[in-house]
């Protein structure tokens, strides 16, 4: 499985599949879509209305990656479950943090 993020000089760009009204705010690992694209599965309690789910996603990622909220922004997919999100910061540290967050969880 390939990584669901790309590195840049400013940080990383992460492909997400978001489940609004998912019961809890959490990162559920990686998923390969039917087209072969790898995404990070994210669920949030917020509803997908008025940008609430997008705000919840950016807050969740900021907290999980240890960056300020202003360092996370939705690049594309604001009205879609599939989103591209930019995270500003050290790309190597962010990539390592995402690897740990998306690693398979023991049963």
Curated annotation (Swiss-Prot):
InterPro entries recorded: DUF167, YggU-like_sf
Family: Belongs to the UPF0235 family.
Protein name: UPF0235 protein RPC_0058
Species this protein is from: Rhodopseudomonas palustris (strain BisB18)
